[in-house]
């Protein structure tokens, strides 16, 4: 399964991340891309960013997010992703079924 992860710096964090934590986060995410655990990662100008993770469950995503070096410095929004072609086929099939019922 694929998950869109949007991360934003957590406002009011008591402890600020160090340069060492920033580098560890970078290396961890780039390594995840090389291993196929993530498809991509992009930063937002001004802080935060997005990535697309590959995982077998929501629990796996949660574990990976909060075990990352900056896991407690971000607020996360996680959205499961569907294959576009399959999604649109399902919508079209549902509409076709509804159209047949209304005839």
Predicted regions and their residues:
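Conserved, structured core segments of small domains
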Residues: 1-103
């Amino acid at each position: 399964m694929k998950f869109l992860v949007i991360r934003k710096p957590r406002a009011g964090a008591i402890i600020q991340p160090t340069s060492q934590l920033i580098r560890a986060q970078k290396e961890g995410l780039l390594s995840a891309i090389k291993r196929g655990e993530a498809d991509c990662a992009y930063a937002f100008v001004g802080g935060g960013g997005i990535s697309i993770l590959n995982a077998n469950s929501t629990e796996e995503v949660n574990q990976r997010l909060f075990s990352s070096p900056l896991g407690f410095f971000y607020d996360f929004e996680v959205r499961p992703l569907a294959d576009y072609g399959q999604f649109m086929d399902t919508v079209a099939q549902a509409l076709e079924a509804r159209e047949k019922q209304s005839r």
